[in-house]
A protein has these predicted regions:
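C-terminal motif of bacterial Sec signal peptides marking the signal peptidase cleavage site
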Residues: 21-24
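Bacterial signal peptide processing site
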Residues: 26-28
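Conserved N-terminal/central alpha/beta ligand/cofactor-binding core
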Residues: 42-56, 87, 93-207, 322-330, ...
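N-terminal Rossmann-like FAD-binding beta1-loop-alpha1 element of flavoenzymes
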Residues: 63-90
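Helical element adjacent to the flavin cofactor pocket in flavoenzyme catalytic cores
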Residues: 185-242, 281, 287
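A glycine-rich dinucleotide-binding beta-alpha-beta segment and adjacent secondary-structure elements
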Residues: 216, 395-479
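Glycine-rich loop(s) and the adjacent beta-strand/alpha-helix scaffold that form part
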Residues: 232-235, 239-302, 495
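An anion/pyrophosphate-binding glycine-rich loop and adjacent beta-alpha core
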Residues: 281-285, 289-393
C-alpha cells in the first residue's frame, strides 16, 4: 500500500486517536459482547481489521524476539528486528494495535531534518538538547537525552523511507523553532503513524497477536527469553525467544498507581487509552529492573473534561490564545505544559478557553475532529463568540486586538510569548474550545541505558531484556516537551529492535 492510500486513512486515524481502547501489555478475560462491539468499531476507525492480526492457532512455541506491546515503539522495534534478519512476534493485550500512539496529536520533534532545511528553518541538535533539558528542569537522563536528539533526524528519515512522511512543521511549548513534524495536511500524527507502522509490519509478515495478555516474563540461564501469554482468555502458554522487548506504555490510566504515586491528582481526567496501566513496569520490576521517577506525572493543560480528549498543542502552535472566564489572557500559551497547567489551575474555576480563528483551524486540521465531537463553539465575530461562550465581550475583543498587535510587533509585552506568532487572529469565523488540565503522560518507569537495555539496581544490564517507549523513566525529566513522546518511541523503538537483533545474532 502506498502513501496515497495511507492518506485516505488519515481522517479515520483522527477518530482512532480518541476512540481506540488499547495500550500495550496485559489484560485478561474473554471478550464480552460489548468488547467485541468495541473491537469492531475501533477496527473501522483505525483501518485495522481482524484479518490483519495473527490467528491464535498460528502461534508458535519459539521466536527470535518477543515484543510485548503493539504501540509505536513495539511496532518500530519489530520492523527493525525483522529487517535485521530475525523472526519477531508482537503480543498486544488490547483488541487492536496502536496504544497511546494512536492518541498522539501535535507531531514528532526532531532537529536538523531535511524537511526543516527545505523550509529554511535553522536548527541544531544542541539547541534541541538544551531546550528539552530546560523543559525537564535539568533532571533528564543526559545520556539518554543526548542519544535522543542526535538520532532524531535519522528517525524522521527512517519513517519517510518507509512511506510515513512528516513534512509539515509546527511548534510546541518550550521549543524555539518549528521542529514538530506532522503529516503533510497538518492533521494529528497518531492515526497516520499507526497506520504506516501497521502497513510496514504487514508487509514484513510480522505476526501481531491481539487480546494477548502477557502474564509473566522469565529468564533462563541468566537471559530473559520467555513469556507466559494468555490469548483471548484461553489457557496461558509459555513462548520461548532469544530476547524480549517490552513496549507497554506508561501508567496514566491506572487509578491505583496514580493514587499511590500522585494522590494529589485524584479526580483528574486522563487522556490515556484504557490499557495504559503500567503492566510492563511491574513485569520488568519483577525481573530485577530498576524503577525510577514514578511520581513524575505530566498534566496537559488543554483537555476536554467530558471524555478526556486531548486538544493538541498544535492548536496553540498555529496561533491560538488562552483566555479565562472573564475573557482575558492570563499566560504565555507556549510555555511548558507544567507552567500553563499551573496557570489554569490558579484560575477560580480551574478552566479556560482556547480562542482561534479560521486561519488556525485551516492550519491545524485536527480541529475538524474536535468540531465533530461538539467541542468547538463558533461566532462570526469575536463579539458573537463572546456571547456564545458567555464571557465579557469587551475583554475578549481587547484580548484578541492586543494579541494581534503583539503579532504585528513581534513582541508580547503582556506575557512574553515569543513563538507561534506568525499569524494574527483576524480571519472569520472565530472559535473557542473550553479546556482544563488532565493527566497525560508518565515520565517515570524503567531505567535503561542508551542501548535500551534494562538496568538492575546496581546499574548493570539485564541480559536479553530491552525496553522502549513511555514505560522508560528518566528521559523527559520533570516535564515532557510536546512532540518528544512520538520521537521517543521511534528513536528508542528502533534502537531496541537493532540492539536485540545484535544480541540474538551474537548468541
Amino acid at each position: 500500500m502506498g502513501e496515497k492510500k495511507m492518506k485516505k486513512w488519515v481522517s479515520m486515524g483522527l477518530l482512532a486517536c480518541t476512540t481506540l481502547l488499547f495500550a500495550a501489555c496485559s489484560s485478561g478475560n474473554k471478550a464480552s459482547k460489548s468488547t467485541q462491539e468495541t473491537t469492531k468499531s475501533t477496527e473501522v476507525a483505525s483501518g485495522a481489521s481482524k484479518s490483519g492480526y495473527a490467528d491464535p492457532k498460528s502461534l508458535k512455541n519459539n521466536y527470535d524476539v518477543i515484543i510485548v506491546g503493539a504501540g509505536g515503539a513495539g511496532m518500530t522495534a519489530a520492523i527493525e528486528a525483522k529487517d535485521a534478519g530475525l523472526n519477531p512476534v508482537i503480543f498486544e493485550k488490547m483488541p487492536v494495535a496502536g496504544g497511546n500512539t494512536s492518541k498522539s496529536s501535535s507531531g514528532m520533534n526532531a532537529s536538523g531534518t531535511k524537511f526543516q532545511k527545505a523550509q529554511g528553518i535553522n536548527d541544531s541538535n544542541d539547541a534541541f538538547y538544551e531546550e528539552t533539558l530546560k523543559g525537564g528542569k535539568g533532571t533528564n537522563d543526559k545520556e539518554l537525552l543526548r542519544y535522543f536528539v542526535d538520532h532524531s533526524a535519522q528517525a524522521v528519515d527512517w519513517l519517510d523511507q518507509n512511506g510515513i512522511k512528516l513534512d509539515n512543521l509546527t511548534i510546541t511549548g518550550g521549543m524555539s523553532v518549528k521542529r514538530t513534524h506532522r503529516p503533510s495536511d497538518g492533521s494529528a500524527i497518531g492515526g497516520y503513524l499507526v497506520q504506516g507502522l501497521l502497513r510496514n509490519v504487514a508487509e514484513r509478515k510480522i505476526p501481531i497477536f491481539v487480546n494477548a495478555d502477557v502474564k509473566d516474563i522469565k529468564a533462563n540461564d541468566g537471559v530473559v527469553n520467555e513469556v507466559k501469554v494468555q490469548i483471548q482468555g484461553e489457557k496461558a502458554k509459555s513462548i520461548k525467544g532469544k530476547a524480549v522487548i517490552v513496549t507497554t506504555g506508561g501508567y496514566g490510566a491506572s487509578k491505583k498507581l496514580i493514587a499511590k504515586y500522585r494522590p494529589d491528582l485524584k479526580g483528574y481526567v486522563t487522556t490515556n487509552s484504557k490499557g495504559t496501566t503500567g503492566d510492563g513496569i511491574a513485569l520488568v520490576e519483577k525481573l530485577g529492573g530498576q524503577i525510577i521517577d514514578m511520581d513524575k506525572v505530566q498534566i496537559h493543560p488543554t483537555v476536554n473534561q467530558e471524555k478526556g480528549i486531548l486538544i493538541g498543542e498544535a492548536v496553540r502552535g498555529e496561533g491560538a490564545i488562552l483566555v479565562d472566564d472573564e475573557g482575558n489572557r492570563f499566560v504565555n500559551e507556549m510555555d511548558t505544559r507544567d507552567k500553563v497547567s499551573a496557570a489554569i489551575n490558579a484560575l477560580p474555576k480551574k478552566r479556560a478557553y482556547l480562542i482561534f480563528d479560521q486561519g488556525v483551524r485551516s492550519r491545524a486540521t485536527a480541529i475538524e475532529f474536535y468540531a465533530k465531537q461538539g467541542y468547538v463553539k463558533e461566532g462570526k465575530t469575536v463579539a458573537e463568540l463572546a456571547k456564545t461562550i458567555k464571557v465579557n465581550q469587551a475583554n475578549l475583543e481587547q484580548a484578541v486586538t492586543s494579541w494581534n498587535e503583539a503579532v504585528a510587533n513581534k513582541q508580547d509585552t503582556a506575557f512574553n510569548r515569543t513563538t507561534a506568532m506568525d499569524h494574527p487572529l483576524d480571519t472569520a469565523n472565530y472559535y473557542a474550545i473550553q479546556i482544563a488540565p488532565g493527566i497525560h503522560y508518565s515520565m517515570g518507569g524503567v531505567k535503561i541505558n542508551t542501548n535500551t537495555e534494562v538496568l538492575d539496581k546496581n546499574n548493570q544490564p539485564i541480559k536479553g531484556l530491552y525496553v522502549a517507549g513511555e514505560l522508560v523513566g528518566g528521559l523527559h525529566g520533570d516535564n515532557r516537551i510536546g512532540g518528544n513522546s512520538v520521537a521517543d518511541i521511534v528513536i528508542f523503538g528502533r534502537q531496541a529492535g537493532q540492539q536485540a537483533a545484535k544480541f540474538v545474532s551474537a548468541q
